[in-house]
């Protein structure tokens, strides 16, 4: 195996024996093969699209396959083998539709086929499937930066499609991007595709924002309970709001309460979910605390997307763990996909929850969130007045991911060290590093404004662009906004590329720069966008307050 897609990759170089995430070598190899098959699908899909037809079935498969390979999603090798077989069938179907639109010699990813599990496992171990097959580290870096950004785009696109919102331009780009990694392109062309991935990430996040808000209303300022009730419960983690909706509806009147965990916390901000009295609040912290949080919750647990981490030997919740969608785990029960026009059947997890003890209380009180673009723009006059009066000197965007590395205490310390005339704008699970601190407010405006899930980083971009307009500025970088971003997985890569496409410069990225950036590619990003690693808390806070 060779995997360097997440921030915690071994020695910030790459995992070669077992993933730091816990991913076994065989699982990593099968995920590589699934991407390899997707490249073959994309070759035919791109040609078909150029001829005037976009194959949505193939596009849907590519989105879900890319999503499957995001860190902390897929753990079951048998499921991955089935996905590979399904991908080969999809590829054959697209190939038949493309017909003479594809000609000439084709790469192995467009022709290799097998239905035999042993042969599939052997292929997953072959050199041609490895990332490291490309000897030129700069080409490899640009290809992987593109693919990893596409994984984030695919995840957001899949969520939007579940709610009935789709754009063929996004699907077409994913095929173009994957197909491009099988071609000999110039460095300039590859950089162009990486920037197009940023543009597509903006489009995907905008589409998902439209899907979520049209379906569930605009997030609003909300005090979220972090204590517990007296009934048994279901803890729902991940990002899928459709699953949240159906679970709340099916648990109503059953005596089973529902709590969010991790990135599902922002579900508490949506008006549509507030009518459910058995929706109690949020339990626990960010994803990497789940071994402890899931244990003390006592009830049933539903993983709708990443992040699911391996169960430890002393954990007892495996028989209470349920997965759904693209998530899977060996030995865990799985809730199947919804039938066309229907809902998922959550009765197995509801019945399991009824047999469980109520959650153990681990904290009490409330946290405040719901500051997506619609809510913040409703407060625009108040915010603008605070900036003009000097009450707010600077905004610091601290969106992104949380993770296990001790060095991530930097983000807590920055939040604590920032002057009291600064406001933190956040989205994603990075918020858990500071959203329970008592940082106060500025004239009634909380000093931590949580927009929501990682995809709601789109809201932070909308807010910045609106402030640019209000203050009559020509450049988004002239705003009193600094960016101190925490990254972990591939959705954060998509968000980073989106910010770069929007012209944002001077982003601090930590706790380490990505291992998949070669020195040359990292140099390009530094020269063109002034991306920089994090430094010491004192130095970075001083620099940000000076607009550097």
Curated annotation (Swiss-Prot):
Q: Which UniProt keywords apply?
A: 4Fe-4S, Cytoplasm, Iron, Iron-sulfur, Metal-binding, Oxidoreductase
* The reaction(s) this protein catalyses: A + NH4(+) + H2O = hydroxylamine + AH2 + H(+)
Which parts of the sequence carry Cysteine persulfide? Answer: 401
GO cellular component entries:
cytoplasm
- Please report the name of this protein according to its UniProt entry: Hydroxylamine reductase
- Free-text comment on the cofactor: Binds 1 [4Fe-4S] cluster.
The encoding gene: hcp
Q: Which GO terms describe its molecular function?
A: 4 iron, 4 sulfur cluster binding; hydroxylamine reductase activity; metal ion binding; peroxidase activity
Q: What is its main location?
A: cytoplasm
One short Pfam name that applies is Prismane
| Lineage of origin | Bacteria, Pseudomonadati, Thermodesulfobacteriota, Desulfobacteria, Desulfobacterales
Return the EC number: 1.7.99.1
Where is this gene product found?
A: Cytoplasm
